[in-house]
Amino acid sequence: MSRSIRIGAAVAACAVMFVLGWGVAKTGVGQAVPFASLTDLERDFTGRMQNVVLVGHFTIEGRETRGGSPERYEIASVTKIDEDQWRFDVRMVYASVDVTLPVVVPMVWAGDTPMVSITDFSIPGLEGTFTARVFFYTDRYAGSWQHGQY
């Protein structure tokens, strides 16, 4: 093998490792705050969010339909990965979207209620940005979403 091919292969391998490293850091894969260090509320939340399905309806402003359109979020797990960063391993099904991926989002607490709070937030694998406030209380969820122009 010629020297230039070996150098090219080494550069390509470095580029692939960089992209993989960036992806792992961005998604928080492999990271987790030790379970023992979670508060009681955080432990309760992670327990409730194991292998759950959130089913609801959404509307698009200006195009509301009676009852809305169906949405479905299949959550395999939720993991705290940093002070206010949580990873949702989720399958999202809404409109023409059907994707499974890890999504790392900031979470804030309103007393005993966890809330995802994102503004102009990019989710790798999905186009556009998202703004949302979604809260979870016992076995319920509710919130407001905006995706791109909708």
Question: Residue locations for each model-derived region?
Answer:
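Central antiparallel beta-sheet cores of small beta-barrel/beta-sandwich binding domains
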Residues: 41-42, 48, 52-150
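Amphipathic/hydrophobic helical signal segments and adjacent flexible N-terminal regions
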Residues: 2-49, 53, 57-66
